[in-house]
Amino acid sequence: MSAVNVAPELINADNTITYDAIVIGAGVIGPCVATGLARKGKKVLIVERDWAMPDRIVGELMQPGGVRALRSLGMIQSINNIEAYPVTGYTVFFNGEQVDIPYPYKADIPKVEKLKDLVKDGNDKVLEDSTIHIKDYEDDERERGVAFVHGRFLNNLRNITAQEPNVTRVQGNCIEILKDEKNEVVGAKVDIDGRGKVEFKAHLTFICDGIFSRFRKELHPDHVPTVGSSFVGMSLFNAKNPAPMHGHVILGSDHMPILVYQISPEETRILCAYNSPKVPADIKSWMIKDVQPFIPKSLRPSFDEAVSQGKFRAMPNSYLPARQNDVTGMCVIGDALNMRHPLTGGGMTVGLHDVVLLIKKIGDLDFSDREKVLDELLDYHFERKSYDSVINVLSVALYSLFAADSDNLKALQKGCFKYFQRGGDCVNKPVEFLSGVLPKPLQLTRVFFAVAFYTIYLNMEERGFLGLPMALLEGIMILITAIRVFTPFLFGELIG
């Protein structure tokens, strides 16, 4: 976009002052950081390469934990007037069977925390619009998530940020993180179209440049994600979803996981897992051969139409444990800091929770006291572990089970589904983890291994008395597999 098409306020930011904070990136997390700090009285500069509405297939389903975080930040109305679609739970399909998993009761979890100076004038309540209804979100006995067209949601977040008098916006490409002679971060250099390379100074610089972060390595050269699989996405139009207002997880012994969720009254997103960082060379043929046979009948017409049009979108599935923010004058946050498998839709929830905790920890500090801020950021790293570890480990563990590529993993996949079918706490506890409202890693460990032992029990029952010796051997292998799938990631998240 040339300078003549950019609003003057996006290129004329003052570079003669020292800002309290510079925020690099205006994805989901950047505007929330900027808005929260501005409402705390901080002078904030937020830099974004392109303020036009993006077209992406990431960040389209927000779990209840993310919705609650938006309430805490006083930014929940960002889901309004974009034809966002309510989400009330999940339906899991496995080899033709299905089980419904509704979101938790509000009475079973703590009330939403309202952050001082951020929540005011009812900005923690949704508004009434064509798809989001006050009575559903405010009065329903259960928590709700929400799905939406990502770009529309992002535009709303950015508009909220733009209304803050303490926020200055810049359209430009951040090309360098500035450091002083002590190697402490003091700002950023931005290439602004029509203005050139401009240096901006700040007491604290936030790196929020997302999945493909250019600057996460400022924390450490080895802070890079691993990519083990990918999703191929399509838009289904006017689809007849088997379980309206539910996310759909379609599993089977002979295929990779398939996710389906509605993002507007007309559009439904389908994401098909592929167990390689590189997508198939002939995506259309792969869709017809390896995915189409397992699509529920009601979805087949819209699925077939989407395949025939061939508008496929691919996204990598990355994993990146968080590192300590131990560089004075800098804070890396969001996907730039920490990523997990997108199977469970927990990315925005983790990022928004991080913003809530961040504002609580440093929002009232004087950012010119850089050592004090650094101390709080080090504490913040450990305080965030309780919730980020649950969502991150759950995402990786469930993907391992749902994309089972060995007999032991397939046994655990079947056992997990049968565990859900028991209902009661066998559904209630897992969905609290999935929703991002139960930040208790030890409880997650207990539930995961309850699934493992239930799988062993089912296998013994299936083998019968004569097959008991074989069942015992298989049980040992199933348990070893469960340990290998779960514990390294939990250890890495909690200890790292």
UniProtKB/Swiss-Prot annotation:
Pfam families: SE. InterPro entries: FAD/NAD-bd_sf, Squalene_epoxidase, Squalene_monox. Its cofactor is FAD. It is found in: Microsome membrane; Endoplasmic reticulum membrane; Lipid droplet. There is a cross-link at residues 284, 289, 311 (Glycyl lysine isopeptide (Lys-Gly) (interchain with G-Cter in ubiquitin)). GO terms for biological process: ergosterol biosynthetic process. Residues 38-474 are lumenal. One of its GO terms (cellular component) is endoplasmic reticulum membrane. The keyword Transmembrane applies. Signal peptide: none annotated. It comes from the Eukaryota. This is Squalene epoxidase ERG1. The gene is ERG1.
